[in-house]
């Protein structure tokens, strides 16, 4: 059995119990939780829609669509609400038998822990009621990519950006407002892209602003500025969660030819190594063209 008192320690932007011990009713919108469990600190988002259905997202890469009763149980369980109090609230909301709800909630808590720990299949092993993906239209996207700039320190001929490199950029204050608006819309995951987003000197500030909201943040980059370990450290300290680095080939000549920048491969490789040495989740991206397909 799982020791929930030691295990389920959540930091939330919303409190479920007031000073008098009364459990608060779940509110529509986006709720953020961080579960501290040893070295693992899953980022959990619960989005409650206007019809009381919900979206449970774990680390921005696993998404579960919940019916209203499962959504409310998740809200109370993530706030570590005692079963007796949760059952009382659930009985009022859904007009179900309180005793049956009490046992359902206890089972649900355990299922939720197993789900977050990735110890169980959400379809085969768990009793959590979900709805099939694509069976309904979500109220908001799961993720939003933000093109911070169209400037770039590479010159790839295959670049898909339609904007000129000199296209005007938004200020940090304008991006703060956009990031806040995305949170208000219920979008828990944002990725900074470009152009080359690391050319923005205020990138750590933008990451930090999103982190304060509770959003998961990622970065799409050619990795060259990550060759500076102190720059990587500044992004990690700001709260960056993951990075995707474009590497066109293991062959320096092929890579540099594709990005039309001599010496770029060396910096990108250093950037990848520095990212791997950090707490970031790291991915690489490769564009398959006639220049490199035979060496992939």
For the regions a language model picked out, list residue spans one by one.
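Acidic, low-complexity/disordered tracts enriched in E/D and polar residues
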Residues: 2-75
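Long, charge-rich, low-complexity alpha-helical segments
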Residues: 3-18, 62-145
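Short glycine-enriched, charge-decorated loop/helix-capping segments at active-site entrances
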Residues: 62, 163-166, 257-262
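Conserved alpha-helical substructure of the radical SAM core
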Residues: 93, 107, 125-242
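Conserved radical SAM core fold
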Residues: 197-199, 223-226, 241, 245-261, ...
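Short acidic, glycine/proline-enriched helix-loop-strand junctions
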Residues: 200-202, 206-222, 253-267, 271-274, ...
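Short, electropositive alpha-helical surface patch
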Residues: 208-210, 247, 293-296
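Conserved strand-turn element in the central/C-terminal portion of the radical SAM core barrel
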Residues: 271-295
């Amino acid at each position: 059995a799982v020791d929930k008192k030691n295990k389920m320690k959540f930091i939330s932007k919303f409190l479920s119990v007031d000073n008098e011990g009364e459990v608060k009713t779940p509110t529509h919108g986006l709720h953020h939780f961080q579960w501290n469990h040893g070295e693992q600190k899953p980022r959990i988002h619960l989005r409650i829609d206007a019809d009381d259905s919900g979206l449970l997202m774990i680390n921005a890469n696993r998404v579960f669509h919940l019916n209203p009763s499962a959504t409310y149980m998740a809200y109370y369980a993530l706030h570590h609400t005692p079963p007796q109090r949760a059952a009382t609230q659930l009985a009022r909301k859904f007009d179900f038998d309180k005793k049956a709800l009490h046992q359902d909630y206890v089972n649900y808590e355990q299922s939720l822990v197993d789900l977050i720990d990735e110890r169980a299949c959400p379809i085969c092993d768990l009793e959590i009621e979900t709805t099939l993906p694509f069976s309904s239209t979500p109220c908001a996207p799961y993720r939003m990519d933000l093109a911070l700039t169209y400037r770039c320190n590479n010159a790839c001929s295959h670049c898909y950006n339609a904007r000129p490199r000199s296209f005007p950029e938004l200020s940090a204050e304008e991006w703060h407002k956009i990031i806040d608006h995305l949170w208000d819309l219920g979008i828990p995951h944002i990725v900074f892209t470009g152009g080359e987003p690391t050319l923005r000197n205020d990138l750590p500030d933008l990451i930090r602003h999103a982190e304060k909201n509770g959003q998961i943040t990622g970065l799409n980059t050619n990795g060259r500025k990550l060759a500076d370990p102190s720059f990587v450290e500044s992004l990690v300290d700001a709260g960056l969660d993951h990075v995707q680095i474009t590497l066109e080939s293991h062959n320096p000549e092929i890579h540099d030819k594709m990005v039309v920048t001599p010496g770029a491969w060396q910096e990108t490789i250093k950037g990848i190594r520095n990212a791997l040495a950090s707490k970031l989740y790291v991915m690489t991206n490769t564009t398959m063209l006639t220049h490199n397909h035979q060496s992939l």
